[in-house]
Amino acid sequence: MAPPVPGAVSGGSGEVDELFDVKNAFYIGSYQQCINEAQRVKLSSPEREVERDVFLYRAYLAQRKYGVVLDEIKPSSAPELQAVRMFAEYLASENQRDSIVLELDREMSRSVDVTNTTFLLMAASIYFHDQNPDAALRTLHQGDGLECMAMTIQILLKLDRLDLARKELKKMQDQDEDATLTQLATAWVNLAVGGEKLQEAYYIFQELADKCSPTLLLLNGQAACHSAQGRWETAEGVLQEALDKDSGHPETLINLIVLSQHLGKPPEVTNRYLSQLKDAHRAHPFIKEYQAKENDFDRLAMQYAPSA
């Protein structure tokens, strides 16, 4: 039986969240819908308007439209928006990343406003992109919102700490079991657990796709469930659907590279996906690691090359 899809209430209080559609679209990876909803919604207070703008600009970041964020968020903007701008600067300026991280380190060493959840999320995102998951986790542990917990779970799963991820998920479920983020985090953990939990994870991704929209995030989640169950051809069909939506989406291309190997596709098929990934995301960690492995192989091959 599929899990329930969350309703538009916040924190189990029964209070309707004016920004539910904006947040929900962002969480499932429907970034253009998030932007459209944010521009349409009428809000009851300036605080809610800042919160709306945070999700609006984060959606632009997810679309790699860094210039929009850098142009529109001014020095006089709210602290939450300044945090989004900081992440935009990091993503947009590869040659300035070290100095941005140093400045962030200085800021973190001072007294941080832990009620500014957006700052904690953006700081953790910078640390994680900078290959410093420990600093990202330390930052997130200062917050107690669902987004901080969900990001903590993502990082713990990447570190193969399923035990800690399950504990964090329990905290999310205690806070709001039916929230979209809790449902997604449950699917991620179930995917890592494997076995009979794979079908439960698939149901969550499928239910959210049916109810909301079959986004790239949800389609890749479904494909991961199929792959983990050995249903490679079914996974390929789902990933092709994702590729039709965005031919340069990194997770889709990486999953297709792995899938092609399992299906015994000709080398040129795998190389084509790899070339697409390089064209769209030359600095992606997968590409960097792949090229490092290629260089290692070339060095080893040279050692065993016959001497003239």
Swiss-Prot record:
Major place of residence: cytoplasm
GO molecular function: structural molecule activity
Membrane topology: Peripheral membrane protein
Residues found modified as Phosphoserine: S13, S45, S99
The organism's place on the tree of life at top rank: Eukaryota
SUPFAM superfamilies in the record: TPR-like
Protein keywords: Cytoplasm, Cytoplasmic vesicle, ER-Golgi transport, Golgi apparatus, Membrane, Phosphoprotein, Protein transport, Transport, Ubl conjugation
PTM notes: Phosphorylated by PKA.
GO process annotations (BP): protein localization to axon; protein transport; retrograde vesicle-mediated transport, Golgi to endoplasmic reticulum
GO CC, alphabetical: COPI-coated vesicle; COPI-coated vesicle membrane; Golgi membrane; nucleoplasm
Family: Belongs to the COPE family.
Function: The coatomer is a cytosolic protein complex that binds to dilysine motifs and reversibly associates with Golgi non-clathrin-coated vesicles, which further mediate biosynthetic protein transport from the ER, via the Golgi up to the trans Golgi network. The coatomer complex is required for budding from Golgi membranes, and is essential for the retrograde Golgi-to-ER transport of dilysine-tagged proteins.
Assembly information from the UniProt record: Oligomeric complex that consists of at least the alpha, beta, beta', gamma, delta, epsilon and zeta subunits.
The protein, known as: Coatomer subunit epsilon
Organism, as annotated: Mus musculus
